[in-house]
Design a protein with these regions (language model features):
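PRPP-associated nucleotide enzymes
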Residues: 1-171
Length: 171
């Protein structure tokens, strides 16, 4: 259980310290909650922060659960940086079904990314098994067997606003 996204991001960034100093590397976050985590990782590692706009299609009656996902090309917060031949640390505040992250990974591979490290605070074991063959490295702090929604693993899990995302990306 994490206190909030800040605590989760700090814990995750400590597991990524070996990436500090890697050239041609970028942290990419899934907006909006993932940007809080991504900002901490990027600042800790001295890497640029960008976003990959994979959006979930919510399950009716369970908005935190993805029925599917797609790449949003509206570029609300700016475009996804060039990832060709780069090392990417892909992050979010957690993974439930894996649909959103899987969509992001496929998008990055089409853009000829160099290597992908998927780093998230929490994801269910069955989803981790499904995703591990899609990335070069997987760093997940908690992999519970019983999983309802990402928010269950945070004491404080408010919605992140567009304004907060813009501020994190600007600073």
């Amino acid at each position: 259980m994490f206190e909030n996204r800040q605590e989760a991001g700090e814990a995750l960034s400590q597991k990524l310290l070996k990436f500090k100093g890697i050239k041609d590397a970028v942290v990419l976050a899934i907006p909006r909650g993932g940007v809080v985590i991504g900002k901490i990782i990027a600042d800790t590692l001295g890497m640029p922060l960008g976003m990959v706009y994979a959006k979930k299609i919510p399950t009716p009656g369970q908005p935190e659960l993805a029925a599917g996902a797609y790449i949003d090309r509206s570029k609300k917060f700016g475009k996804t940086p060039d990832v060709k031949d780069k090392t990417v640390i892909l992050t979010d505040d957690g993974i439930a079904t894996g649909a959103t992250i899987e969509t992001a990974i496929k998008y990055l591979k089409k853009k000829r990314v160099g290597k992908i490290t998927l780093a998230v605070p929490v994801a269910p074991r069955d989803t981790v098994k499904k995703l591990k063959h899609l990335v070069d490295k997987l760093i997940i702090l908690e992999t519970p067997a019983h999983f309802g929604a990402v928010g269950e693993f945070y004491r404080d899990f408010p919605q992140v606003t567009d304004e907060e995302v813009e501020q994190l990306v600007r600073n």
